[in-house]
From Swiss-Prot:
Entry GO CC: cytoplasm
First-level EC class: hydrolase
Oligomeric and partner information: Heterotrimer of UreA (gamma), UreB (beta) and UreC (alpha) subunits. Three heterotrimers associate to form the active enzyme.
Protein name: Urease subunit gamma
Annotated transmembrane regions: none
Protein family according to the UniProt entry: Belongs to the urease gamma subunit family.
Catalytic activity from the UniProt record: urea + 2 H2O + H(+) = hydrogencarbonate + 2 NH4(+)
Keyword list, A-Z: Cytoplasm, Hydrolase
Keyword Cytoplasm: yes
Length: 100
């Protein structure tokens, strides 16, 4: 299987997001990379399901709370940005203050 660099990056992000989801399900608090991967992978999947940019921006802010992440992580993450593919092309999705 031959993947472009972008496809490899998306696959790695998906894998990291799945690992973060498993850790969250076990009750572990997520660290910085796990938090970014968790939110990003959920956004990419929601875009694939047909959600709009505006819907993704709102959805991304509902995925995690301060109780889901390690102390200080919420203050470290001001925005999460991800390029997602939509029927009309690739767009940048920005979620402001994703952990509330």
């Amino acid at each position: 299987m031959h993947l472009t660099p972008r496809e490899s990056e998306k696959l790695l992000l998906h894998l990291a997001g799945e690992l973060a989801a498993k850790r969250k399900a076990r009750g572990l608090k997520l660290n910085y990379p796990e938090t970014i991967a968790y939110i990003s992978s959920h956004l990419l999947e929601a875009a694939r399901d047909g959600k709009s940019v505006a819907e993704l921006m709102n959805y991304g802010a509902t995925l995690l709370t301060r109780d889901d992440v390690m102390e200080g992580i919420a203050e470290m993450i001001h925005d999460v940005q991800i390029e997602a593919t939509f029927p009309d092309g690739t767009k940048l999705v920005t979620v402001h203050s994703p952990i509330r």
